[in-house]
Amino acid sequence: MRILVKLICFTILLFSRKSVYCKQHVIEGDILVHKSELLRNAVNRESRLWPNATIPYKIVASEWRENPWMLYLILDTMNKIEAQTCIRFVPRSDEKSFLVFNSNTSDCSSYIGRIGRPQPIYIGPRCAAVTVAHEIMHAIGFQHAHTRPDRDNFIEILWDNIKRKKQMNFEKANSLDYTTFTQFDFDSIMLYDPYTFSQNRKATLISKVPGIDIRRKSEKLGLSEMDVISINTLYKCDFNEKLRKY
């Protein structure tokens, strides 16, 4: 029912990627950041959270006519997040801060948290369902798990296997700029695929924990239980009502 309601009430937004953000950059493969902004403290700043855990959104309806399946994935992902957390996605009315789902790209990328103005989430035709969830979780306020300050206790970065120009994407965050809510989660959709940015088809990050491997993105079905706990903790949700796995 929620999907039908959102399909009926989504709003058409007609502007191009270039006209809105001519100074945006992509780091870590899919994180959008304005050149004047600091990335690492996004989660730690209250201003980057969505007030009342409510996220207004607009969908450029005309862009999805040739690929309605991607539109379904977006709406289905929002429904699943709502079922697990106190996050609510609502069609934008007059809010200044809102998400804009845009398909005019081959990329999958998003800003981290609320940036205080219309902000795009680019969902290209090659974005899988788990990638859509990954980008929306960025927009909710979460960074990549492989940059956690404590990551060296759980994973090893294989620098020799990483493309030289992409090695910056594996830099570790410092503890002042990165908030963690759970133990390291190998099932998180925010953890890099083990072959991300490989220059030789070998793994770029591996597990240090015996008996646990880093799964491919294609093997993940959606938010992990600890992803859900992290969202609920960040937004002070009611755990008793919202902690159920789908």
Predicted regions and their residues:
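Zinc-dependent metalloendopeptidases
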Residues: R2-L7, T11-Y246
